[in-house]
């Protein structure tokens, strides 16, 4: 991979040789690994053996052909434009803001009137995730759009610094039995908000649509 010398991310890059006060494990890139904060892992070179200064971008497969995205907002395009050859591409770079619901999952047994904690993680390639919101809707289609009136603030865990995963949680008491759809939305320090529409490109890159989890709430005994 190659990075422009004017790219500010170079000031944050690390050549790592240890992890948790131990030599870097083989699976994590021993003996040294390049860390490019906020960027997709294709830049995090394992087994780093050399760094070269070039007078132009590297033209190897992984820069010129692989891991490329449309040069459009959010890397979005259409199959028709790809087929017609109308898509200009650029190397993939930063990860978009994204969040996940970790628990409950679809197999969790929930009980009406019994409080539970919804938990998840959030991160962004543009800094820290500094806002989380949760939406809980009964009999709500998992493919329908969400409105701003549906969002409730969630509690964020400790901030370990830019680009790190950040936990979040929200306590919810299901009011009655039924099917509910949970949705989570993150916002990062640059003001980027997780969208509720998908993105399409041939590689499937940059997908960060709001995640949903359907749960079933039963009656209390």
Ranges and model annotations:
Residues 1-221:
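Extended, aromatic/histidine-rich regions of cofactor-dependent oxidoreductases associated
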């Amino acid at each position: 991979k190659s990075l422009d010398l004017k790219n500010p991310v170079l000031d944050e890059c690390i050549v790592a040789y240890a992890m948790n006060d131990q030599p870097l494990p083989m699976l994590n890139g021993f003996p040294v690994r390049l860390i490019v904060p906020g960027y997709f892992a294709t830049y995090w070179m394992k087994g780093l053996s050399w760094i070269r200064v070039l007078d132009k971008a590297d033209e190897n497969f992984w820069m010129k052909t692989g891991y490329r995205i449309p040069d459009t907002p959010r890397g979005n395009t259409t199959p028709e434009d790809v087929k017609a050859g109308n898509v200009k591409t650029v190397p993939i770079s930063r990860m978009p803001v994204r969040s996940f619901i970790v628990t409950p999952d679809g197999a969790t047994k929930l009980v009406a009137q019994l409080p539970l904690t919804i938990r998840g993680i959030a991160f962004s390639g543009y800094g820290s995730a500094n806002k989380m919101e949760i939406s809980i809707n009964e009999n709500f289609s998992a493919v329908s759009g969400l409105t701003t009136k549906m969002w409730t603030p969630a509690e964020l865990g400790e901030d370990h610094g830019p680009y790190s995963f950040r936990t979040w949680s929200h306590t919810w008491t299901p009011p009655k039995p039924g099917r509910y759809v949970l949705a989570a939305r993150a916002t990062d320090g640059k003001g980027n908000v997780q969208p509720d529409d998908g993105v399409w490109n041939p590689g499937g890159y940059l997908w960060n649509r709001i995640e949903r989890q359907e749960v079933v709430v039963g009656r209390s005994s």
